[in-house]
Design a protein with these regions (language model features):
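Active-site neighborhoods and metal-handling regions in enzymes and metal-associated proteins
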Residues: 1-218
Length: 218
């Protein structure tokens, strides 16, 4: 955490500045064509006729900003469309897709809410799984008959308290019992487990998450 009285210099300063400007660029690229803050009707019509940038174009432009500070985009940095009770909807933008082959799909449209993520690294930007216990989970739409009473009890508490939102095991009434109860839930696909990950060469990384709404003029 950088305090108000601290002076950041060197590569740490590059990371902070690069993240800020890359994020500002991404936020502007998220605006659907035609949503101008000002301008004549002719200018607005001309803007509305333009095509939105593709996923590849967005990723390429953000990477150019990162490279100007000698940084790399953290692979699979993902921006999601938010829907009611759903933080990871069917539309997403993936910056610097990794070797898993997953690609983004869709572009922002008027009347949507998005969670815009930006992550840059002083290192390679490649990720690795960390040897730490996973503590973050969320419920999926998968139906599975749980056999253990402890699993059913844990899932019941999760449904009542969190719905489909992400939660930490510490937020449950009995964390020790929850550690046992979630095992079958994860194995059966009822819960998604978020595995801890970090930078491949342990270099410093930055993360920003901005919630935006692409609203029409009122």
């Amino acid at each position: 955490m950088v305090g108000a009285g601290d002076v950041v210099t060197g590569r740490d300063a590059d990371l902070i500045l690069g993240t800020y400007y890359a994020n500002e660029l991404l936020l502007r690229l998220m605006v659907p064509p035609g949503l101008l803050a000002g301008g004549s009707e002719e200018e607005k019509k001309k803007a509305a006729a333009q095509k939105p940038p593709t996923q590849a174009q967005i990723s390429s432009l953000v990477e150019k900003v990162a490279k100007s500070y000698d940084l790399n985009v953290v692979e699979n940095t993902t921006t999601w469309l938010f829907e009611r009770n759903e933080l990871e909807s069917n539309k997403k933008i993936i910056l610097s897709p990794g070797a898993n082959g997953v690609r983004g799909e869709g572009v922002p449209e008027v009347g949507e809410v998005w969670g815009v993520e930006m992550g840059l690294s002083l290192g390679s930007g490649k990720c690795k799984d960390l040897d730490h216990r996973a503590t973050l989970h969320r419920r999926t739409n998968t139906t599975y008959i749980l056999k253990r009473p402890s699993s059913r009890q844990t899932l019941s508490e999760i449904v009542k308290k969190f719905g489909t939102f992400i939660f930490s095991l510490r937020q449950l009434d009995d964390e020790k019992a929850a550690k046992v109860g979630v095992v079958e839930c994860v194995r059966g696909g009822v819960l998604r487990q978020y595995e801890p990950s970090g930078e491949l060469d342990n270099s410093p990384v930055s993360r920003l998450l901005t919630t935006i709404g692409t609203l029409a003029e009122s």
